[in-house]
Amino acid sequence: MTVRFMDVFTEWASTYDDTVTGHDPEYKEVFRRYEEILDTVATKAISPVVEFGAGTGNLTQRLLDRHQDVLAVEPSPEMREILIDKIPTLPVQDGHFLSFTADHAKSFVSTYAFHHLTDEEKGEAVDLMAQILPQDGKIVYADTMFVSEEARLQTIAEAKAQGFNGLAEDLEREFYPLIPVMEQIFASRGFDVTFTQYNHFVWLVEAEKMGE
């Protein structure tokens, strides 16, 4: 996973902040309610918190506004450089969902990142986080996902019809999950999980680790 989409991260690093603010019409709906999504993830997090795919630090800054103990994990050198320039005092680790070092955490969070993992890798990542989380610890993230395969294919067809070929290629290339698959991944690992939709693409997932 660490190198699978590294070229995408490298290409997007310099323009990511413009994209999330709606300047790219292809991704305008993907990032609708972006500020609200970030604020909600940050509010639901519990310190100490580990953020995966910290990128250019948009969620990271909100986490720091609310929590004392924040670790950012980011695989892209270009993204890490921007992040460190923005927040020089932040602990930043070169890593990703399947390769990181965290001795303790009460929550793991991410936004627009979990889809880089295959469904099998998503399960592996949840296993790794579950080993560290205490009872009542949480995994909180926002990402594109679909209620069914039919919904995913329909969204791709609509993107192509609008001439949003970059978005369509993105939806076909990466591993955007189905909600029933994610429900099974979390439930089978002892998490109580909820899904809340924020726009056509993005859902917020809050998974709490239950007792034995």
UniProtKB/Swiss-Prot annotation:
One of its GO terms (biological process) is methylation. InterPro entries: Methyltransf_25 (IPR041698), SAM-dependent_MTases_sf (IPR029063), Uncharacterised_MeTfrase_YrrT (IPR023553). Coiled coil: none annotated. The keyword S-adenosyl-L-methionine applies. One of its GO terms (molecular function) is S-adenosylmethionine-dependent methyltransferase activity. Keywords: Methyltransferase, S-adenosyl-L-methionine, Transferase. Its EC number is 2.1.1.-. S-adenosyl-L-methionine binds at G53, E74. Belongs to the methyltransferase superfamily. YrrT family. Could be a S-adenosyl-L-methionine-dependent methyltransferase. This is Uncharacterized methyltransferase Exig_2346. It comes from Exiguobacterium sibiricum (strain DSM 17290 / CCUG 55495 / CIP 109462 / JCM 13490 / 255-15).
